[in-house]
């Protein structure tokens, strides 16, 4: 049944009349000057004329049938007379009007006031162009209600699942609004995640649809997809290369984990947790297993990864970071494969482009959002994201057809085992994966037991070399329990228990000596000695724990959802994050309040996410929900660790825009199916042929054994890393270090008397060591406001040269007051330091940079050679 021309045009112009009236009311409701400016009155007149003209055309369309038929026949061709150019031109007009109408006023400079006056009419024009597109769609497809019913019937499972998921989203929204779960600040509480800009989403969709439109070669044409493995290999490599180039060419900015650049080398050296991980990697480079010296290697696989990066790129931190970016840029390529398998190549491309854009925002916005983790930081969150994407891919390949030999189960177990040595949170995924597999296998419980057993076996194979090393060094294989006990239990759980004795000190992510205490937010950490969280009330002991776990878990979900655009305005990253001041979603004290625009957009985005989830359930059942379920499990693991938001959600927040993109492409596919002329035989349910057909490549045992061998060799590289390098620091005693200075004629150049040196050597508070210096930073607190935000334990009164020094038994922070920055101080230089030990650092009295031409630096002013100072 087609819509008749009078009804079609009458509806079109009637809706245009209502839209013009709404824009006119909005303009008149806004405050203006007393006399109403000429420009304002001109726009009022323009909207009034537009409204009256639309109303007149509405009446004309309904009252004069012949005129309506003549207009539709001339300007809106249908059937075989339809040509795509009108649709393309109107689509371009709509995009241009949207770009103009939603342009922020600050981008227009002195013309901003005139633009603000004209904006209501531009909004009307944008809506009118969108209506025209819909009219072209309606007349092209013919709008047969039987087709709509058939589509609903064929997509019944997907639509029902989508509505169920959307209902759960809305229920969660209601619970958050009533209980304030996810909005009540806690100790390790980061801001909302790194946002995607709406122009980036539109660009990603355009790339995806352009790829879908390249049907001339048959690779992307709906319903005619071919396996095209080589095509996928090419696309995979192109995405990898584009991501590596884009991220490496995005300028790095000052951030908490990579502050700077500071003289003398003007590099973004790592700090806080990133510094700990890199210093852990420096010990194997001098042939020392740090664990044998009493250190706890917090992230063993990631630190070992840095060992080999340094072995290839040297100690130039820029080269190391660039090489890391090249490797981690595989992440969007993995999302492409996952999207292609779950749905289609356009979904994979959309997810990959969004991933590239999001990390560009993270790199550029590190100063704006502060506690982020990016591929350009020596942090463990983004490598975990790569591991989680690969894990989701393998689990889907495993569970989409449980009749296969479990080669993918073995590979997935190995990946999860390796992930546990990057961060501890993935341990929580183990029971969730086993449970997902149980649902996937159904009544085939013997197959489930066998596959789960192989999964767990390869997991053990992956971690076995490091467990063996820990038994030899620390007497226990459970390398993760030390971090859980000290970092999580003592610093995060005990303070929440009303009757517990709270340990002194601040939470720290490392047990290494000299490690800096770094709360997750820039603001002061709230006092939680007797109150689990602000607003927790008189909760019982277990109630307090339940509250902060649920609170952080909810905050993780909220922060992840809000990475999608919440405004139609084409703001830049700075204005998105900081444009609304204290009302910004990224403000430290954001109370959960959303604007009407944000609510509408968020509801639309949640609907698309629900459609993506619903489609995956209808097509793949539990296997299609693997990314979603692992995301929820990881978010809950963060809640159990009492961490949330910001950098903590980086490993899994990609799942949000992944399902969002899947739902968006699926809607576009449905719309594209309606563009087929009446009578051409639409196949609404087969417009997508997922590139995951079962058939060849059922998986063989040799593939599983190969996966086991690979993960074992990766795991073995951890304890072996320190055996590939020799220890240059064979002298560890104070007298031995002074002997080196004397032999090189440097002892006399220090300017201290012999008896003073002898007395200083016997002083128990003295520090005389031969080691390697890293990350030299000259901090001038008068000229650099950000300098005060790092090294909180150092005095902030005078400029300092600060660097880290590792020796075979420990690493220390060296502080040397200096009037000006040294001209020469290379990173990873061998040095001899004389100083006085304090609680958190060494107060330097002399620093000697060794080499062919040794350089001596003394404090300004020069101090007596005695301790304490």
Where does each model-flagged region fall?
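Start-transfer (signal-anchor) and selected internal transmembrane alpha helices
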Residues: 1-22, 36-99, 113-179, 183, ...
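Extracytoplasmic catalytic/substrate-binding loops of multi-pass membrane glycan-assembly enzymes
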Residues: 249-280, 290-308, 314-318, 474-480
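Lumenal/periplasmic acceptor-binding loop at the mouth of the active site in multi-pass
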Residues: 257, 262-266, 273, 495-611
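Membrane-interface transmembrane helices that cradle and orient dolichyl/undecaprenyl
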Residues: 284, 383-408, 437
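Transmembrane-helix motifs of polytopic, lipid-linked glycan transferases
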Residues: 319-350, 390, 607-614
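Transmembrane-helix signature of polytopic, membrane-embedded enzymes
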Residues: 335-370, 386, 403, 620-629
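Perimembrane helix-loop-helix junctions
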Residues: 429-460, 468
